[in-house]
């Protein structure tokens, strides 16, 4: 078996990536989320494939076809709720994975980090288009509002929006193309994940100390395969509790009303995992400014390697920047809450304050904190 594992062209690649891979001996459970994201992607592709077998991407039958899946298809309700809540689990793992990268300075592996940002955008695009497919009220109005933001682009905006819609409003053509893109994107994401891993294995994993771990490596299997398996069990348990006991807790009740272009819901809002970005978008009165802030709220991650001023890589031994980091986490939770609230006092001013704080912490406060910590270390 050892000979095949090390000699066979295909198995050799798997061996170098998941079995004989040298890994730092001290990586904590925060390093589990990469494998959990891979699992989430697999769950989404498999459940999505079965849903696509029964779904029809036509405005007249889309809503009914989803109801048909839940009522008439064997275990269709389970497949549908695993797919819907699987998306939420995907984003929870994504946010924790990115948060880990920011905390431990993993952004210094620039190729891996930038590939991760591309993946984040791709997953967000996929999730957005997937939310449109059931063709409920929030699906329709969410698609209308978010695609309409592109009209803020000078000169080509209006033409671009009508080109994406395939007409003068979100309609049959829009739904069909969104289904096509929603189907193909996860496979593109899978290819990007392989590139992400390729870049990661060029440098090797980071670790909680932020120090070079070449002197103390252990094989990935069995140490981290068994550790990842525990994470897998916990993820599946949480997903099944969500899908079986609270299937609609993260959804919007408005999406159980078929799409009606003549009736606008009182509060248009996206799924919970987009609320922080939606709050930043809404906190700027200007349309183009809001769109730019929305894109920057994610793209700012690409600036992190440039904004790194500390002589240390991780935040493990940096209490001042640690404080900034946890304030940033709290700020993101506030933004998520604000994104789901109506546009009125006091939510507007809270959202604007939280948006300013978000960018200020990343661009100004954390780099300054890094320099202060450098000076403290130089005092002797």
From Swiss-Prot:
Membrane topology: Multi-pass membrane protein
Keyword Heme: yes
Subcellular location: Mitochondrion inner membrane
Binding residues annotated for a ubiquinone, in chain numbering: 201
Keyword tags: Electron transport, Heme, Iron, Membrane, Metal-binding, Mitochondrion, Mitochondrion inner membrane, Respiratory chain, Transmembrane, Transmembrane helix, Transport, Ubiquinone
GO term, biological process aspect, one: mitochondrial electron transport, ubiquinol to cytochrome c
Cofactor(s) it depends on: heme b
Residues given in the record as heme b b562 binding sites: 83, 182
Extra remark beyond the main annotation: Heme 1 (or BL or b562) is low-potential and absorbs at about 562 nm, and heme 2 (or BH or b566) is high-potential and absorbs at about 566 nm.
Function field: Component of the ubiquinol-cytochrome c reductase complex (complex III or cytochrome b-c1 complex) that is part of the mitochondrial respiratory chain. The b-c1 complex mediates electron transfer from ubiquinol to cytochrome c. Contributes to the generation of a proton gradient across the mitochondrial membrane that is then used for ATP synthesis.
Subunit composition and interactions: The cytochrome bc1 complex contains 11 subunits: 3 respiratory subunits (MT-CYB, CYC1 and UQCRFS1), 2 core proteins (UQCRC1 and UQCRC2) and 6 low-molecular weight proteins (UQCRH/QCR6, UQCRB/QCR7, UQCRQ/QCR8, UQCR10/QCR9, UQCR11/QCR10 and a cleavage product of UQCRFS1). This cytochrome bc1 complex then forms a dimer.
Family from the record: Belongs to the cytochrome b family.
Protein's name according to its UniProt entry: Cytochrome b
Organism of this sequence: Alexandromys oeconomus
Gene: MT-CYB
């Amino acid at each position: 078996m050892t000979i095949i594992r090390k000699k066979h062209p295909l198995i050799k690649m798997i061996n170098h990536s998941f079995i004989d891979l040298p890994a730092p001996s001290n990586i904590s459970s925060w390093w589990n989320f990469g494998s959990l994201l891979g699992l989430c992607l697999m769950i989404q592709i498999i459940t999505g494939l079965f849903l696509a077998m029964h779904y029809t991407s036509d405005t007249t039958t889309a809503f009914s076809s989803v109801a048909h899946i839940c009522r008439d298809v064997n275990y269709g309700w389970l497949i549908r709720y695993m797919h819907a809540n699987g998306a939420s689990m995907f984003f929870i793992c994504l946010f924790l994975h990115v948060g880990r990268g920011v905390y431990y300075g993993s952004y210094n592996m620039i190729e891996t980090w930038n590939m991760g940002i591309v993946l984040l955008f791709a997953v967000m695009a996929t999730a957005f288009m997937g939310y449109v497919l059931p063709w409920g009220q929030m699906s329709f109005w969410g698609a209308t509002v978010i695609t309409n933001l592109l009209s803020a682009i000078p000169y080509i905006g209006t033409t671009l929006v009508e080109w994406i819609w395939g007409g003068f409003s979100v309609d049959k053509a829009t739904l069909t193309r969104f289904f096509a893109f929603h189907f193909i994107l996860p496979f593109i994401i899978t290819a990007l994940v392989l590139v992400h891993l390729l870049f990661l294995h060029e440098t090797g994993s980071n670790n909680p100390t932020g120090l070079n771990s070449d002197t103390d490596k252990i094989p990935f299997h069995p140490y981290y395969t068994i550790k990842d398996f525990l994470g897998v069990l916990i993820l599946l348990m949480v997903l099944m509790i969500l899908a079986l006991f609270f299937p609609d807790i993260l959804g919007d009740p408005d999406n159980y009303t078929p799409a009606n272009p003549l009736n606008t819901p009182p509060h248009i809002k996206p799924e919970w995992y987009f609320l922080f970005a939606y709050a930043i978008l809404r906190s700027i009165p200007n349309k183009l400014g809001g769109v730019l802030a929305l894109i920057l709220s994610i793209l700012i991650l690409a600036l992190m390697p440039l904004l790194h001023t500390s002589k240390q890589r991780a935040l493990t031994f940096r209490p001042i920047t640690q404080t900034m980091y946890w304030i940033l986490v709290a700020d993101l939770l506030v933004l998520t809450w604000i994104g789901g609230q109506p546009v009125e006092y006091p939510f507007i001013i809270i959202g604007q304050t939280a948006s300013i704080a978000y960018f200020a912490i990343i661009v100004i406060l954390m780099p300054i904190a890094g320099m202060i910590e450098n000076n403290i270390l130089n005092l002797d």
